[in-house]
């Protein structure tokens, strides 16, 4: 039996009958168009709520082609060119996609551009270089031979990056490229608002304006071979203009350099420790963006329509987790559901009436092709999202893309029917209330609340070799029975640590925004965390936590005394490090499966092989059972009182340390898996001295999780796999109940 509501269906031209059929099958109460599509009159007449995608700053080439100096701009960094004499020529566009980017020759290059000696870091005097505009080459004189040089130059963005991606992915052939425009320019800003006002008048059947999105695209640049060159889902690189730079200088009292944007080629990645110029630009940009977003929302309301923001594409500057977002007047936020982390990124946004998730797969040919089974991805996506939804509900769900593609796959159609019904059933049973969280966990990094659920990310929901060992922290937490918040080092320095926090997690590689970089040289930060843990708090470090970029004070991890582990940075090799025996059985590792033969061999090896001499050593036979991801090399216990739980290959992967009334725990890495989510859950309960609370509402099988809803007197058990699972759930009174769950299954019981 299909229930109805809470579902948004995409449609397109000449597909009215099938749209009606699928709307009934999936219980859709709203219909939307997708990029490049329109809704038929017959679809508009179905009586469903109508979402209409609106692109404020593209799809009007008739305007922008007459004002090509008012497209968005970006500072680009050329390749490094080696000087072999006292002159060097630097080509501007050699590694950039000329259909997307075009050098800005209109604004004075000597005012807005920069030539830098990358060997010394010095800026080359503007008198020593000239621009050959015909060849897009900068000629530099008076340089030092065997030094590398670059040009940081302004470029117009002449093809909307999202439309470009869709164009290239779907092979749209000779379809006209949509040129974006920048509302920072008064004439273009007036055009945008005048156009929107007319669109509102011309769209009486639209109920929800689905802004996709607003004004500035996250950093997405392609190279000369039409490949992705630079991507940063949080990047503000594509937000620049000479006018904005001049206004920034007038407001903040200093002038931004091109280097403040290109950042030596890092383009201010969210992984970089944020600097003052970067933070100031974000504040400047978000102030401007939000002022104009509010005007669009107010216009939507005046026309009797809701204003919905898509969290993606041109979302830069909206900053949904920055204070004041609730003042913009937006009714809703919708975003792409890639996994549990991105689900929470949407669900936890404050200040809107409702949130909506656009589930995967997207109805595009790269997934919906003959021989593929998109239902596999659909269920996998649902399982990842479901565990997060139970912890922080989203109000609605839907899909995107071309419905005509999805309709050709009957198994997928049936899968979505099941998912939609289950989604609504969860809401009906819980009333949209989150499951109970048993601990309060804080993620500590440079960004804090402003980047809630956005840590350890480069591209949306796409972990890679350098990130997956840390991204798994968020993915594990997204569906765990804990309450999660994000705090910054500035928060701790200014206000201390909130009294209701049970555990703080700091993790990531050295010298990144997520571990903190030089902030750990501030003794007040170290004092505050130490005192808090000593008094009964819990600190969990992952990877290279609390690491200072340079070896100093005899420590690399500045809180090595708290977590019981430090990392050898080749400065103290002449000092022996001794490893205590690894503890084979512990509360933290109670659910870790270990092959009996491996355990026997490990025990016969005496738990460890102590190697005196430089660097010490440990355990030639690993106990195994845990995936720590990319190895963190040369970690060692700071003393022999540290409890080692895994220490393979001469370094520590998992350890605990008593610290006064509190505890520290070290984990070298945590890729997401059910086993690792269970491991982290046990770490959090142990570190916070809450072992006695762990059993209630726990599942014996890590592949299954329990969500308790005390207000409703209910609990559910979910199977997070595509295989049947058995588990035993322990209730609050210590009794147990057995469950036999089908693949992807969910079971409800009265609590």
UniProtKB/Swiss-Prot annotation:
GO terms for biological process: carbohydrate metabolic process. Changing residue 364 to N: Decrease in activity. The keyword Glycosyltransferase applies. Keywords: Carbohydrate metabolism, Glycosyltransferase, Transferase. It is an enzyme of class 2 (transferase). SUPFAM superfamilies: Class I glutamine amidotransferase-like. Pfam families: Lact_bio_phlase, LBP_C, LBP_M. The keyword Transferase applies. Changing residue 362 to N: Lack of activity. It comes from the Bacteria. Homodimer. This is 1,3-beta-galactosyl-N-acetylhexosamine phosphorylase. It comes from Bifidobacterium longum subsp. longum (strain ATCC 15707 / DSM 20219 / JCM 1217 / NCTC 11818 / E194b).
């Amino acid at each position: 039996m299909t229930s109805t509501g809470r579902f948004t269906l995409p449609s397109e031209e000449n597909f009215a009958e099938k749209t009606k059929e699928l709307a009934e099958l999936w219980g859709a109460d709203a219909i939307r168009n997708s990029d490049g599509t329109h809704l038929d009159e017959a679809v508009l007449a179905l009586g469903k709520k109508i979402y209409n995608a609106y692109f404020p700053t593209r799809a009007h080439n008739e305007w922008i082609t007459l004002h090509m100096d008012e497209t968005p701009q970006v500072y680009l960094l050329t390749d490094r060119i080696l000087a072999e004499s006292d002159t060097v020529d630097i080509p501007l566009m050699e590694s950039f996609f000329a259909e997307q980017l075009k050098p800005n020759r209109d604004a004075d290059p000597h005012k807005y551009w920069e030539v830098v000696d990358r060997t010394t870091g010095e800026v080359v005097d503007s008198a020593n270089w000239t621009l050959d505009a015909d060849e897009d080459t900068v000629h530099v004189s008076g340089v030092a031979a065997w030094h590398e040089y670059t040009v940081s130059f302004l470029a117009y963005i002449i093809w909307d990056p999202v439309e470009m991606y869709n164009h290239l992915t779907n092979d749209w052939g000779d379809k006209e490229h949509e040129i974006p425009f920048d509302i920072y320019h008064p004439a273009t800003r007036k055009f945008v608002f005048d156009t929107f006002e007319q669109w509102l008048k011309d769209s009486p059947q639209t109920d929800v304006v689905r802004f996709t999105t607003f004004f500035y695209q996250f950093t997405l640049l392609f190279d000369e071979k039409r490949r992705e060159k630079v991507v940063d889902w949080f990047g503000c690189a594509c937000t620049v203009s000479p006018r904005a730079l001049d206004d920034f200088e007038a407001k903040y009292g200093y002038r931004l350099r091109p280097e403040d944007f290109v950042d030596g080629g890092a383009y201010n990645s969210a992984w970089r420790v944020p600097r003052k110029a970067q933070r100031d630009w974000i504040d400047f940009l978000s102030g401007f963006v939000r002022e104009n977003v509010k005007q669009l929302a107010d216009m939507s309301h005046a026309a009797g329509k809701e204003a919905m923001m898509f969290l993606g594409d041109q979302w830069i500057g909206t900053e949904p987790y920055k204070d004041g977002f609730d003042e913009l007047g937006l009714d809703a936020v919708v975003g792409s559901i890639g996994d549990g982390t991105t689900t929470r990124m949407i669900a936890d946004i404050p200040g809107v009436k409702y949130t909506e998730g656009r589930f995967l797969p997207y109805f595009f040919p790269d997934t919906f092709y003959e021989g593929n089974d998109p239902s596999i991805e659909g269920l996998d996506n649902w399982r990842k999202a479901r565990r997060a939804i139970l912890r922080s509900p989203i109000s609605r769900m839907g899909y995107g893309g071309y419905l005509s593609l999805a309709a050709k796959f009957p198994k997928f159609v049936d899968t979505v029917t099941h998912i939609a019904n289950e989604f609504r059933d969860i809401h009906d049973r819980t009333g949209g209330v989150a499951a109970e969280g048993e601990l309060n966990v804080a993620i500590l990094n440079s960004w804090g609340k402003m980047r809630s659920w956005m840590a350890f990310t480069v591209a949306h929901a796409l972990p890679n070799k350098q990130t997956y060992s840390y991204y798994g922290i968020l993915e594990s937490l997204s569906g765990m029975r804990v309450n999660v918040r994000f705090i910054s080092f500035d928060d701790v320095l200014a206000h201390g640590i909130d009294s209701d926090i049970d555990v703080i997690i700091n993790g990531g590689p050295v010298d990144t925004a997520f571990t903190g970089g030089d902030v750990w040289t501030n003794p007040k930060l170290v004092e505050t965390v130490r005192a808090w843990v000593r008094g009964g708090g819990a600190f969990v470090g992952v990877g290279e936590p609390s690491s200072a970029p340079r070896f100093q004070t005899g420590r690399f991890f500045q809180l090595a005394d708290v977590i019981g582990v430090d990392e050898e940075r080749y400065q103290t090799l002449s000092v022996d490090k001794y490893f205590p025996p690894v503890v084979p059985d512990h509360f933290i590792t109670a659910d870790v499966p270990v092959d009996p033969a491996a355990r026997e061999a490990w025990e016969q090896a005496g738990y460890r092989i102590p190697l005196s001499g430089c660097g010490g050593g440990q355990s030639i036979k690993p106990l195994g059972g845990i995936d720590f991801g990319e190895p963190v090399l040369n970690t060692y216990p700071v003393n022999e009182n540290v409890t080692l739980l895994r220490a393979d290959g001469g370094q520590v992967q998992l350890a605990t340390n008593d610290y006064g009334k509190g505890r520290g725990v070290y984990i070298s890495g945590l890729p997401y898996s059910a086993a690792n989510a269970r491991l982290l859950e046990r770490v959090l309960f142990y570190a916070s001295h809450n072992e006695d609370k762990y059993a209630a509402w726990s599942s014996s099988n890590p592949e299954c999780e329990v969500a308790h809803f005390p207000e409703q007197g209910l609990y559910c058990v979910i199977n997070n796999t595509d295989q049947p699972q058995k588990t035993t759930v322990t209730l609050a009174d210590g009794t147990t109940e057995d469950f036999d769950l089908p693949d992807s299954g969910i079971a409800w019981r009265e609590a």
